Amino acid sequence: MAYFIDRRLNGKNKSTVNRQRFLRRYKSQIKQSISEAINKRSVTDIESGESVSIPNADINEPMFHQGRGGRRHRVHPGNDHFVQNDKIERPQGGGGGGSGQGDASKDGEGEDEFVFQISKDEYLDLLFEDLALPNLKKTQHRQMNEYKTHRAGYTANGVPANISVVRSLQNSLARRMAMTAGKRRTLHELEESLEQLAHTEPAQLLEEERLRQEITELRQKIARVPFIDTFDLRYKNYERRAEPSSQAVMFCLMDVSGSMDQATKDMAKRFYILLYLFLSRNYKNVDVVYIRHHTQAKEVDEQEFFYSQETGGTIVSSALKLMEEVVRERYDPSQWNIYAAQASDGDNWADDSPLCHQILANQLLPMVRYYSYIEITRRSHQTLWREYETLRDTFDNFAMQHIRDQDDIYPVFRELFRKQTVGH
C-alpha cells in the first residue's frame, strides 16, 4: 500500500495565491461593495469581516461564442421533433440579472450575485487604502511609529507566491553536493581502479565484476538523492517595520447639544469610529483627545465620548477654547503634528459663530497641521457654516464637508483624509 504525506507548509491555505489574485483583479468592485456595506453596519460593528457581493457580469471570463442573429446550420443529436426548415419559436423573456428588482416571470433564467467573505484585515486594508494624515511633518523630537512592509531576507515558511526560485535551487545544489560528495569521491576512486585493472595482466575478472557492481550501486545511490526537497525551499520574507514619523495628536470635537437628535449623533459617532480605526490601523502611537460640548466643553475618555447621554444648549466656541488650552498645556506645536475633526449639526448661538471664526483664525489654525469640520444636517446651512466658509478660502489646512445622511459618511471620510499626491 502506498502512503502520501502532505508536507506542504500552507496546506490549510492552498488557495491563498488564488484569493490574493482575485482580490487584486476585482479590487474596484470589492471596494464599491465595501463602501455600500459599511453604512448598513451598527456603530459598534465597523471592524469585523464582511460578506462582499459582486455582479456575475463583472467576473465573467471572456469567451468566443456565436453572435446573435444570422442563419446557422447545426446538428443536434437525439432530435425527434424538428426537421429541416422548421422554425423554432424564440424563448420568451430573458436572462435575469439576479438583482431581485422588477416583476416576477415564469420564463427566463438568471444567476445570483457572487458572494464571498473577506477577513477583518482584508476589510480594513481596503477600507483605508490610499488614506493618510495630511501634512504630516517629521521632526527631530520624540517620535511615533508608522508601520511599513519591507523585505527581510528569506524564510523556510511562506506561500507559493513568495517562493524564491534562485535561492531554493542554490539550497538544492548545496544539499545534493553535501549528500553525494563522499559517494562521488568513492565512485571516482573505483572508476580509476577499474581502469587500471583493465590494463593489468593476467585479467582479474572477479575483481573487475566486483568493482563494476560497487560502481553501479554508488550511481544508484547518487541518483536516488532528490533534485529538490521541501527543506530546500526558501520564501521571500516580509515584515512590518516601524518607520520614524513625527508624533501626532487628533482632537475629536463632537456637538452633543439638544439640537443633535439621536440619528445625527449616531452619524457623528460612525465618523469618529472610522477615524479611530484609521489611526490605530496605520499609526502605532497617536494621541486622541475627546471633547464633548454643548454650552460647556469637557475633555472625556473614549467610553464617555461615545456613550454619555449628557446634553444641553449650544456654544461651539467652548470646545475650541478647551482645545486651545489642552494644546498649550500638553502639545507643543513645534514637537507635535496637531489635527482636529469637529462634527456638529451647524446649530449655534448666533453671536458665538463670529467668535469661533476668530479663535480658529488667530489661535488654532496657525498651530494645527489640518482641521476638518463636518456638518451633519439636512437643513440649510446657518451662520457657523458661513463663518467657516471664509476660513476655508483663507487657510489651506482647513477643510469642511457636508453629511446629509448615512450614505455620505464614508465618501466624506475618504475625501477628508485621502493621500495627497506630489503635485498637491
From Swiss-Prot:
Question: Quick one: where's region Disordered?
Answer: 46-109
List all Basic and acidic residues biased stretches.
77-90
Task: Output the superkingdom of the source species.
Answer: Bacteria
Which residue ranges have biased composition labelled Gly residues? Answer: 92-101
Under the heading PANTHER family, the entry gives: UPF0229 PROTEIN YEAH (PTHR30510:SF2)
Annotated HAMAP family = UPF0229 (MF_01232)
**What family is it from?**
Belongs to the UPF0229 family.
What protein name is recorded for this chain?
UPF0229 protein PC1_1960
Task: Give the species.
Answer: Pectobacterium carotovorum subsp. carotovorum (strain PC1)
